[in-house]
């Protein structure tokens, strides 16, 4: 099964290489020229030796002619090798570039369920670290494998032209190297694959801990974090040592075999010289060829070991690429440019895990322009409703429609373009403030941008930056406070002018003073737009047209703030408990 997996991975890699077949062919041709030039040199050296020994005198004219030929073939071989390396580099890094691009494109199409259960660090490790390891192995394979195989074939031809018996001595002993390399390759692949997987776990854990440094410090969990990391580190060290142990056997073992070959040729060759079967110059050439013949076996065995690591890493990247994407768009799905904002849930059932229902028989009608607040305890299904609206997940049964159209009959791009979404977790990209806030509407005018910036209360602190709206910020927001980053995200949504809004915990990380400032802006933004508001701070949703109180996936109360307070039910108790605190 493992062997089958390796060959499947190799076939997938070859499909990428096929795109750059011109470099592949060029590498083979250049490798042939390099090998031919290299192998001509021992032949010429042997001729020079025989010329001097046969006559006992040195004919400088003939010797210089041979030396010029040696110099010419040396230059040809060197130039061919240089261009071969350029071609190999171009092919390798083009393949890795395509692989990374496809991996990133794949991430953009993966269902949220995959991203929910796979840490970001583990995915990053596949795209960055594993792709780098794959590139190193592939480059070594192209650089040494082509030349090595051709050197073996070329030296075999040259040795046969000198003496068949001596050639048989070399050929009979050398296959021992292949047997050793095959054994080592099987063993090392298993450990290199484990090494890649644990490296991914280590990267994921590091990312998680770095992002949560404040929490770790606040709860004095440094020792536990170090202990947990040490466990992963020890596992990686153990597996790496095993992988290196088996891969390190290859070189000394094959060198030992090569020494036997070289010694055998020397002994048998001496008898042939004494019997007149070969000349001293021919034996000199043959010894050089024997060395060149056995050397690639040593290199190829090392390359095979490195390729095992590369294949293991490539397999992890392909595992990501082969994950099922979001379900395809339904045939005939439409792409409305605008939505009125009428939303209908009709007997909707949904569960993240089979046989563990979260939302059951949920029904709701929302008229265009209504503001719907969703409240309830943790795990009640608040965020799940948002996930269903954005079609991050598909409902199990029932119907979810916008403007009378089932959301499955609307393309995901059009559906998601119709919503403006403010999340609790702020997300900014490296770039200017302007690029961040106009992401959803790059063509917005300067005047309109400033107007909305003032409504969102960002114009003041942005204008004080060194380059104002053209100041470059990092993805973590740099020196901006959490509240300022939240305001930037809100401004980004407002500038996109969406038809519908989703405010998921939008003001939970903003201080009371800042919260009061943005409420006015939100009122302006929500005017005439269907809005869904998820918040734990009930004081922020008192103006909602409809408040849904969820518990265990069911609507247990429904109404506006005043009517729900009059009922003195779950919402009333929840509101009172927050007000008192």
PLM segments and residue spans:
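Short intracellular "coupling" helices and adjacent cytoplasmic loop segments at the cytosolic face
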Residues: 1-3, 93, 101-125, 129-131, ...
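A short amphipathic helical element positioned immediately N-terminal to and/or at the very start
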Residues: 6-19, 123
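Juxtamembrane loop-to-helix connectors within ABC transporter transmembrane domains
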Residues: 17, 49, 84, 88-92, ...
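Transmembrane helix-loop-helix hairpins at lipid-water interfaces of multipass membrane proteins
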Residues: 24-80, 87, 161-165, 276-280
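An intracellular "coupling" helix at the cytosolic face of ABC transporter transmembrane type-1 domains
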Residues: 112-113, 129-138, 142, 150, ...
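Cytosolic ends of transmembrane helices, especially the final helix of ABC transmembrane type-1 domains
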Residues: 221, 245, 262, 292-320
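ABC-type nucleotide-binding domain
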Residues: 329, 336-581
């Amino acid at each position: 099964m493992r062997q089958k997996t390796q060959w499947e991975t190799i076939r997938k890699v070859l499909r990428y290489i096929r795109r750059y077949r011109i470099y592949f062919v060029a590498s083979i041709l250049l490798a042939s020229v390099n090998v031919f030039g290299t192998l001509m040199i021992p032949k010429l050296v042997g001729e020079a030796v025989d010329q001097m020994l046969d006559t006992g005198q040195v004919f400088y004219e003939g010797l210089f002619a041979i030396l010029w030929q040696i110099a010419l073939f040396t230059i040809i071989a060197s130039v061919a090798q240089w261009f071969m390396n350029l071609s190999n580099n171009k092919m390798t890094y083009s393949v890795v570039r395509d692989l990374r691009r496809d991996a990133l494109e794949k991430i953009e199409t993966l269902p949220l369920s995959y991203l929910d259960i796979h840490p970001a660090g583990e995915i990053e490790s596949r795209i960055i670290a594993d792709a780098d390891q794959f590139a190193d192995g592939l480059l070594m394979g192209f650089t040494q494998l082509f030349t090595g195989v051709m050197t073996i074939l070329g030296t075999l031809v040259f040795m046969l032209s000198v003496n068949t018996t001596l050639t048989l001595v070399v050929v009979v002993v050398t296959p021992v190297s292949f047997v050793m390399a095959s054994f080592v390759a099987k063993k090392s692949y298993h450990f290199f694959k484990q090494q890649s997987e644990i490296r991914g776990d280590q990267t994921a854990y590091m990312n998680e801990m770095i992002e949560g440094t404040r929490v770790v410090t606040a709860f004095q969990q440094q020792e536990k974090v170090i202990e947990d990391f040490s466990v992963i580190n020890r596992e990686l060290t153990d597996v790496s040592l095993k992988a290196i142990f088996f891969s390190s056997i290859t070189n000394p073992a094959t060198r030992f075999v090569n020494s036997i070959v070289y010694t055998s040729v020397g002994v048998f060759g001496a008898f042939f010289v004494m019997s007149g079967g070969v000349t001293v110059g021919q034996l000199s050439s043959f010894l050089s060829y024997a060395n060149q013949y056995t050397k690639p076996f040593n290199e190829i065995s090392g390359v095979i070991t490195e390729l095992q690591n590369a294949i293991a890493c490539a397999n992890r990247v392909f595992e990501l690429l082969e994950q099922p994407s979001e379900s395809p768009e339904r045939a005939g799905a439409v792409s409305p440019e605008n939505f009125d904002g009428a939303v209908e849930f009709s007997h909707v059932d949904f569960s993240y895990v089979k046989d563990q229902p979260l939302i059951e028989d949920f029904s709701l009608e929302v008229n265009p322009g209504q503001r719907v607040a969703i409240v309830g305890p943790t795990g009640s299904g608040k965020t799940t409703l948002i996930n269903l609206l954005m079609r991050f997940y598909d409902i199990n049964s029932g119907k979810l429609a916008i403007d009378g159209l089932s959301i499955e009959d609307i393309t995901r791009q059009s559906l998601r373009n119709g919503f403006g979404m403010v999340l609790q977790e702020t997300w900014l990209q490296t770039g200017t403030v302007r690029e961040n806030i106009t992401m959803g509407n790059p063509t917005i005018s300067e005047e309109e941008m400033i107007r909305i910036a003032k409504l969102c209360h960002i114009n003041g602190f942005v204008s004080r930056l060194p380059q104002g709206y053209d100041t470059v910020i990092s993805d973590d927001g740099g020196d901006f406070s959490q509240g300022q980053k939240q305001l930037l995200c809100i401004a980004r949504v407002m500038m996109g002018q969406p038809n519908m809004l989703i405010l998921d915990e939008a003001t939970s990380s903003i201080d009371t003073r800042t919260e009061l400032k943005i409420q006015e802006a939100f009122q302006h933004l929500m005017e005439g737009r269907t809005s869904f508001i998820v918040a734990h701070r009930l004081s922020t949703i008192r103006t909602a047209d409809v408040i849904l109180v969820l518990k265990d996936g069911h609507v247990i109360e429904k109404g506006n703030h005043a009517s729900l307070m009059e009922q003195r039910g779950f919402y009333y108790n929840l509101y009172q408990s927050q007000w008192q605190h």
